[in-house]
């Protein structure tokens, strides 16, 4: 069903528990390939939803014992793929093609369902399944630990549901039921396409959530410290307080955030915001989106993976040693409510 607001009907279709049939996924064997952030959440939530699930891992995986202790059936990847009707691939994007070719492809049977939580490899053609299998996606809009936590607390994280290939005629029934199994139907399942999920997800990560946000925070911190302000104060102003502002926006929108801050801060938002995110920034965003759409970014990422992640590791080291990180570690050690890393 479509969801209506007071102003207009939303362009997307959102489905809830009453709109899906749990018996579909409960009547199928599911193989979860991988037991990382999303893998553990999918496997445990499905198991708790009464689904026959097994986890496929490489021999000697450090996650093998962890999954078994959680009550899951654990096998090697080939066995999981051979036994399953629905094979959910939840290893990292860059190794999915290799895992698919070496452990999954030979075990696919007509009528099986190949599933993903991100459309990267299907959309860009790095994995090309046979025509006689379903290809679906259940993409929770949150990290795995949140997907699991929300499920155990009785709620759920919204899911995107997509069908790329419907070989059996009931691929939509399967993906919607799968989303129910991981808790998505509790908060809403949004119908989308593989192209929409892949391109919008990558753009959001690069231009706003990860790339844009990190560079904005770094630039603010560097501007203040280069002007002679103490790094500790710069950290508080440009980094620490960010969560509080985002929480207000997340809970009730930008208007509520503006209601909650001072008039001085709100006026500064309107004055300075367009100077920081200006037409040049918007043109850069358009170029980022274009490179995502035409596959240039995907190929660059794959090339770097094939080169031993050279660029990724260099950039990771640079941010890990940036003054904002060393300052942040010192500041956060003062906060008793922040859980310390082991």
Swiss-Prot record:
It comes from Slackia exigua (strain ATCC 700122 / DSM 15923 / CIP 105133 / JCM 11022 / KCTC 5966 / S-7). Pathway: Amino-acid biosynthesis; L-isoleucine biosynthesis; L-isoleucine from 2-oxobutanoate: step 2/4; Amino-acid biosynthesis; L-valine biosynthesis; L-valine from pyruvate: step 2/4. Its cofactor is Mg(2+). The keyword Transmembrane helix does not apply. Residues 12-192 form the KARI N-terminal Rossmann domain. Its EC number is 1.1.1.86. Keywords: Amino-acid biosynthesis, Branched-chain amino acid biosynthesis, Magnesium, Metal-binding, NADP, Oxidoreductase. It is an enzyme of class 1 (oxidoreductase). Binds 2 magnesium ions per subunit. InterPro entries: 6-PGluconate_DH-like_C_sf, KARI, KARI_C, KARI_N, KARI_prok, NAD(P)-bd_dom_sf. This is Ketol-acid reductoisomerase (NADP(+)).
């Amino acid at each position: 069903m479509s969801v209506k607001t007071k102003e207009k009907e939303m362009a997307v279709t959102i489905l809830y528990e009453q709109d899906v049939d749990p018996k579909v996924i409960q009547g199928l064997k599911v193989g979860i390939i991988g037991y990382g952030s999303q893998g553990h959440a999918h496997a445990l939530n499905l198991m708790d939803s009464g689904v026959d699930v097994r986890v496929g891992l490489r021999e000697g995986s450090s996650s093998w014992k962890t999954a078994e202790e959680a009550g899951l059936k654990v096998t090697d990847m080939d066995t999981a793929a051979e036994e399953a009707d629905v094979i959910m691939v939840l290893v990292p994007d860059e190794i999915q093609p290799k895992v698919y070719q070496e452990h999954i492809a030979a075990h696919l049977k007509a009528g099986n369902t190949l599933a993903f939580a991100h459309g990267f490899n299907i959309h860009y053609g790095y994995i090309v399944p046979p025509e006689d299998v379903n290809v679906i996606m259940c993409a929770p809009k949150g990290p795995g630990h949140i997907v699991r936590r929300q499920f155990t607390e009785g709620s759920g994280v919204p899911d995107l549901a997509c069908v790329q290939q419907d070989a059996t005629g009931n691929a939509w029934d399967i993906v919607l039921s799968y989303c129910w199994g991981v808790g998505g139907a509790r908060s809403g399942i949004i119908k989308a396409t593989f192209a929409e999920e892949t391109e919008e997800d990558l753009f959001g990560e690069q231009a706003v959530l990860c790339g844009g946000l990190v560079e904005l925070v770094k630039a603010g911190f560097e501007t203040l410290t280069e002007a002679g302000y103490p790094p500790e104060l710069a950290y508080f102003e440009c980094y620490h307080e960010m969560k509080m502002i985002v929480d207000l926006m997340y809970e009730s929108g930008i208007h509520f955030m503006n209601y909650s801050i001072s008039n001085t801060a709100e006026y500064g938002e309107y004055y300075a915001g367009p100077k920081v995110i200006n037409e040049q920034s918007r043109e850069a965003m358009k170029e980022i989106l274009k490179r995502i759409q035409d596959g240039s970014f995907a190929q660059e990422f794959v090339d770097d993976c094939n080169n031993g992640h050279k660029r990724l590791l260099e950039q990771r080291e640079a941010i890990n040693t940036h003054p904002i990180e060393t300052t942040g570690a010192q500041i956060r050690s003062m906060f008793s409510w922040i859980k310390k890393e082991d």
